[in-house]
Amino acid sequence: MNIKPLGDKVVIKKVEAEDKTKSGIVLPGSAKEQPQMAEVVAVGPGGVVEGKEIIMELKVGDKVIFSKYAGTEVKLDGEEYTILRQNDILAVVE
């Protein structure tokens, strides 16, 4: 099953947080930070959203940094994704 976002929406898959600190301390699940890095897996067509022309600047495969608590988390075929607006993407990592 595929997710096809509408308008200015983007579907991302989060990159998991590290299990250990740089000094080698193992972190329990509750101590890990909410990941803010992800890979873009689907991009909406853009168009006119709330009266403004939106041109999509992202493409599938981009590595991005996004707002910490942005978007809606969904589970599909056992995989977790986040759907958010292109505005919630802060940067593309090259």
Swiss-Prot record:
Main subcellular localisation: cytoplasm
Keywords in alphabetical order: Chaperone, Cytoplasm
Biological process terms in GO annotation: chaperone cofactor-dependent protein refolding
A GO cellular component annotation in the UniProt record: cytoplasm
Pfam families for this protein: Cpn10
GO molecular function, one term: ATP binding
Assembly notes: Heptamer of 7 subunits arranged in a ring. Interacts with the chaperonin GroEL.
Function summary: Together with the chaperonin GroEL, plays an essential role in assisting protein folding. The GroEL-GroES system forms a nano-cage that allows encapsulation of the non-native substrate proteins and provides a physical environment optimized to promote and accelerate protein folding. GroES binds to the apical surface of the GroEL ring, thereby capping the opening of the GroEL channel.
Protein name: Co-chaperonin GroES
Species in which this protein is naturally found: Alkaliphilus metalliredigens (strain QYMF)
Encoding gene, per UniProt annotation: groES
